[in-house]
């Protein structure tokens, strides 16, 4: 990907925003070239026994340009199980009007690298401002891009889901329920610490933070036919809560500061106030 940007200011004629009408001493031009690359391999295996017992295995093997060789690739497997209880002989005798009752569960590991800046495993330089160097006039300057972190890698989400779906009398009443839990670890954060001002660098991103997201969803539906008229309606309700498992932060200065401002082990979006 290549980009080129130019601009100026102090236009002599404000209604004509062309470069030629701007102050020549304020004209600037810049550009950059960027290469990105992603690769992946996806696989899935299904097994169905008599339309009653269902198993699925899947995996992703993903690679990204953002991390160094050795941390570049991640393997993320998953498995899901299903049991169609309504296909069992004993259940058909017990509840013959129940069209479908399926119990399901799944577990998967998912990787993500979207929140990370690229090439943090490399030391390097970037253009930064202009400087007057002796009698040579204005010269473009450069600065370091920051401390390198060669250990940076994917952050992972471990996702578990348990639920069921049921349908009675050809969908006259249907219910779906799912409970889920997602544990994320290795989220990007900058370590809190003080460095000497003469060091001239900032701390890099690391795989530090983690959180836990739990919740459930329920969907209730109804469909029917009256003469030549078919209709269906449904309603759903869901709730979720996110808890900060670990958040990188400065050490508390006292017990009150720790109680008031330490979010570790607490739910997100807590509101503080006086009870009335």
Predicted regions and their residues:
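Extracellular/periplasmic, surface-exposed regions of secreted and cell-surface proteins
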Residues: 1-269, 273
């Amino acid at each position: 990907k290549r980009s080129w940007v130019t601009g100026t200011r102090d236009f002599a004629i404000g209604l004509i925003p062309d470069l030629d009408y701007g102050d020549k001493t304020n004209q600037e031009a810049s550009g950059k070239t960027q290469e990105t690359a992603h690769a992946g391999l996806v696989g899935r295996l299904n097994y169905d026994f008599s339309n009653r017992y269902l198993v699925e295995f899947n995996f992703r093997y993903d690679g990204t340009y953002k991390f160094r060789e050795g941390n570049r690739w991640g393997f993320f497997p998953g498995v899901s199980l299903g049991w169609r209880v309504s296909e069992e002989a004993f259940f058909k005798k017990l509840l013959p009007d129940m069209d479908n009752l399926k119990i399901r569960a799944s577990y998967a590991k998912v990787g993500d690298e979207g929140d990370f800046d690229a090439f943090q495993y490399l030391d390097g330089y970037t253009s930064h401002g202009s400087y007057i160097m002796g009698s040579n006039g204005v010269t473009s300057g450069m600065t370091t891009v920051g401390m390198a972190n060669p250990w940076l890698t994917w952050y992972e989400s471990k996702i578990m889901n348990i639920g069921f779906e049921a349908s009675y009398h050809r969908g006259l009443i249907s219910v779906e329920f799912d409970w889920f839990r997602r544990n994320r670890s290795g989220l990007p954060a900058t370590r809190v610490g003080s460095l000497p001002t003469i060091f001239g660098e900032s701390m890099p991103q690391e795989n530090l933070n983690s959180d836990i997201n739990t919740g459930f969803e329920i969907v209730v539906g109804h469909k029917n036919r009256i003469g030549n008229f078919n209709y269906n309606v449904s309603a759903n309700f869901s709730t979720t809560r996110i808890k900060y498992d670990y958040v990188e932060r400065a050490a508390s200065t006292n017990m009150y500061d720790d109680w008031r401002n330490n979010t570790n082990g607490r739910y997100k979006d807590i509101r503080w106030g006086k009870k009335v």
